[in-house]
Amino acid sequence: MKTENIPYKIYLSESEMPQNWYNVRADMKNKPAPLVNPGTGKPMGFDDLRPVFCDELIEQELDNDTPYIPIPQEIRDFYKMYRPSPLVRAYCLEEKLGTPAKIYYKFEGNNTSGSHKLNSSIAQAYYAKKQGLKGVTTETGAGQWGTALSMACAYLGLDLKVFMVKCSYEQKPFRREVMRTYGASVTPSPSNTTNVGRAILAKDPDTTGSLGCAISEAVEVATTTPGYRYVLGSVLNQVLLHQSVIGLETKIALDKYGITPDIIIGCAGGGSNLGGLIAPFMGEKLRGEKDYRFIAVEPASCPSFTRGVFAYDFCDTGMVCPLAKMYTLGSGFIPSANHAGGLRYHGMSPILSRLYHDGLMEARSVEQTSVFEAAEYFARTEGILPAPESSHAIRAAIDEALKCKETGEEKTIVFGLTGTGHFDLVAYQKFNDHEMTDIIPTDEQLAASIAKLPKVAE
């Protein structure tokens, strides 16, 4: 192992933890487009969103101008249970690759949820409790978000109803049991318990489900059950705001040792982890203070950035949610049942979509067999079993490090290791038994889905 002045793990003290979330929209010249009411075609304001979301979260969702928003003390106290999270220098990986590149990863898996999702779940549950609500509803893909929200709701005494994407519900039964242990009810989606679920099943009884389906069901229950609101784990502005703690901690840790990254990499499904990781660095780029390369990595089976279009679309399959302007494959697109359940979303964060459209970041798609090759390589060198979602970022980080090996450049690479893969062993089994396949949508399939996008006057 190499020995340098930089420790293997950089830990911040509790006093160095961020006291404010950073709102990257404040520094964006071109703001994300507003959410639009599908019935009227007009931008949605506070009153329009109240039946679905908690009041203070709506304020955060609509705030494009305040750069720093204070983190309530109660949330900061909860963060101390598992934060600050370590920034790790991947010395072992560097040595194994034989690269001159310096590789760092921000590890968000040191909590029971196994991922970064707890950063936003406690914030959203806090505001729901503060509003006097009885409970909340949500969707979950691989189960990390549902687990994180079940932990937050148990801590604050809120009821929770989770709709879990059917293929993940079946692939990850133990993740389901963790949620139930924390008091949540968990229903496979699509289900026969909602109108939208029944409609989807009537059209395709064998569907594996999608995050878009699960969102539709969760929103339906929230809006028809008194004392409930819907909360979500990704995509919208409020979630990326809460996740900015990842990037803020990362920047503080790097600055302590005088490290400036050249490349920052994150996996991209709905955008919560990537948006949180890059936030303060993107702010510097937007203000003209520094320049970085940002790389979003998505599954080839659900390539919203790389093969989607930048347009208004429904956030959910059942078309009950507001319209968001984002990179999308069409709300009716159901990706193949790949093992990165947290990345199986048809769209992308409006914030990240705007930044990508403006040329401020890059995107690439990778096949899941290649992703698991990288995951296994990383596990054998760094000792952490990574989540399939996180492994998309690992794949790109390794590829960039190997490019440095060819050129001799000593670039500094930072990537987000969003969580662990302890509940993803069915996926690892498929890979180890050589039963994993890559199913990539055809141009015709994507064109058919995109052709059904709603028409919105801009």
Model-assigned labels for residue ranges:
Residues T137, W145-T208, S304-D316, D424-D433:
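Active-site-proximal loop->helix
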Residues Y68-P70, I200-Q238, I246, G258, ...:
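Active-site/ligand-binding loops adjacent to catalytic centers
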Residues A123-L133, T147-D159, R180-T181, I278-G288, ...:
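Alpha-helix C-terminal capping segments
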Residues F107-L118, V136-W145, V239, I265-G270, ...:
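Active-site nucleophile and cofactor-binding loops and adjacent substrate-binding regions
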Residues P86, Y105, K117, Q124, ...:
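Buried hydrophobic positions in well-ordered alpha/beta secondary-structure cores of metabolic enzymes
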Residues A268-G276, Q368-D433:
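Claisen-condensing/thiolase-fold acyl-transfer catalytic domains that form or cleave C-C bonds
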Residues S120, A128-C167, T260-L274, F294, ...:
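A short, small-residue-rich loop immediately preceding and capping a beta-strand
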Residues T3-L133:
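Positively charged, low-complexity intrinsically disordered leader regions
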